[in-house]
């Protein structure tokens, strides 16, 4: 997730068998390169365990085009100020080939949830326990303010 002023601004994501990151890498940087008359190139950089900068060039060629294009669309929506709860709802409603807990779209939604301020009202959510429309985000989880119901532990 790329941020400006601590708010999500763009998403770099896709599905790939060829994009390998060592397990110790928890963060890195995306750099943008634009040569006149050519397409923009995004590289991923991180520091290895010895502190050396490692560059994985051309992220867009590393990922399946369909998912890279989804990421570009999501980034455009974020840049134009759509509230995160609506962005997450949009992503959740995408139709992708697989639909289980570890899908690409669920991963993107989980990553974005971290940036929702506590107390933000959930989009069109009714509590399954008490049927009230008092569901809000707290620590990235949905919780009902009326009865306390949550799926997070």
Model features per residue range: what roles?
Residues 1-153:
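Long, C-terminal-biased catalytic regions of enzyme "large/alpha" subunits
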């Amino acid at each position: 997730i790329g941020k400006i002023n601590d708010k999500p601004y763009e998403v770099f994501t896709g599905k790939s068998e060829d994009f390998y990151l060592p397990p110790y890498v928890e963060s890195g940087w995306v750099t943008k390169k634009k040569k006149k008359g050519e397409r923009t190139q995004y590289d991923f950089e991180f520091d290895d365990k010895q502190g050396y900068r490692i560059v994985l060039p051309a992220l867009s060629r590393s990922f399946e085009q369909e998912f890279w294009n989804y990421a570009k669309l999501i980034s455009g929506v974020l840049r134009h100020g759509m509230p995160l709860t609506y962005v997450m709802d949009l992503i959740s409603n995408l139709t992708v080939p697989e639909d289980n807990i570890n899908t690409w779209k669920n991963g993107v939604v989980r990553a974005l949830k971290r940036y929702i301020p506590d107390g933000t009202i959930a989009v069109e959510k009714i509590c399954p326990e008490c049927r009230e429309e008092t569901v809000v985000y707290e620590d990235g989880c949905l919780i009902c303010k009326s009865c306390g119901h949550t799926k997070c532990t």
